[in-house]
A protein has these predicted regions:
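NAD(P)-dependent short-chain dehydrogenase/reductase
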Residues: 113-168, 173-184, 212-214
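C-terminal substrate-binding subdomain of Rossmann-fold SDR/epimerase-dehydratase oxidoreductases
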Residues: 156-157, 162-289
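Conserved Rossmann-fold NAD(P)-dependent oxidoreductase catalytic core, especially the SDR/UDP-sugar
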Residues: 35, 61-103
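Rossmann-fold scaffold of SDR-type NAD(P)-dependent oxidoreductases
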Residues: 30-36, 77, 197
């Protein structure tokens, strides 16, 4: 795995989120759960919808109830801004109606309801609705929009733009991590039963492609084609800034530059084909489809 191996404060337990017995042993004497376990995102989920439902939904309520029974104080759930679906509203806040377009986002919305219906003063539930993550990380993904565009532009000098007008909120991976730490350390009354959007830059897919193109030294061609992905939304993240004083420290342009620097230094191998960077390819390689 890509987790730190020599951190005395980190105990890595290999297990399955569906294994309640293992979870019961692992969660004892802990204060908080940050729930990140899921098959992400829509394309990966659709490879094996049955497995996707088991991982993303069926085992969620048992984990929430177990955490509550074990006296865990705080449960932070990583939902998704895709729960909003298509929105014409200029600024989509946390109060907007949920109109998920896919099973992946539908199960995210249902898990939100499950968590909030089980919270009390001794079991605090908080929901994060992240934008799409971008930038370099130890567990690198190159199947997310900004990272896809940067990888293609750098290595093939071509960016394929599917659609173009769809709005896609994004957030740098380092700020995404910071948002979880912010919620984890916040005053109880500020995060109890709260939902927070986390995504401070909302650009169209075409605008993202142009940003990438501008950062590549060589000439990069943009190729346009139709897209079946109609998700489009402009999320407003003012709430987490106002209540928790959270502001991003990095932006999309820095994420692009970070990736280019990594490519220049050849820190990632075979970035167009290495299954480790693409969830679908990884699932196929270990027969999860």
């Amino acid at each position: 795995n890509n987790l730190p191996q020599n951190n005395k404060n980190l105990n890595v337990i290999k297990g399955d989120v569906r294994d309640l017995n293992k979870l019961k042993i692992s969660l004892k004497n802990h204060d908080a759960v940050i729930h990140l376990a899921c098959i992400s995102n829509d394309p990966s989920f659709e490879l094996n919808p049955k497995l996707g439902q088991e991982i993303n939904f069926d085992c969620f309520e048992p984990l929430v109830l177990l955490s509550k029974d074990l006296g865990i104080k705080q449960f932070i759930y990583a939902s998704s801004s895709s729960v909003y679906g298509v929105k014409e509203t200029a600024e989509v806040t946390e109060e907007a109606s949920l109109e998920p377009l896919t099973d992946y986002s539908k199960f995210k919305a249902q898990c939100e309801s499950i968590l909030l219906s089980n919270t009390n003063n001794n079991f605090l539930g908080t929901i994060i609705r992240p934008a799409t993550v971008c930038g370099y990380s130890p567990r690198q993904r190159l199947d997310l929009v900004v990272n896809i565009l940067t990888n293609l532009a750098y290595h093939k000098k071509i960016i394929k733009v599917f659609g173009g007008s769809q709005l896609r909120p994004n957030i740098h991976i380092s700020d995404m991590v910071r948002s979880y730490l912010c919620v984890l350390n916040a005053d109880d009354q500020k995060i109890k039963n709260q939902i927070f959007n986390v995504g401070f830059e909302n650009y169209s897919v075409e605008k993202l492609a142009l940003m990438v193109q501008k950062n590549i030294k060589d000439k990069v061609e943009l190729q346009y084609s139709k897209s079946d992905d109609n998700r489009s939304y402009h999320i407003n993240s003012e709430k987490i800034s106002r209540l928790l004083d959270f502001t991003p420290q990095k932006n999309i342009n820095e994420a692009i530059k970070d990736l280019i620097n990594v490519f220049d230094k050849k820190l990632l191998s075979n970035t167009l084909s290495n299954q480790e960077y693409f969830n679908i390819k990884k699932m196929q390689s270990i027969n999860l489809t």
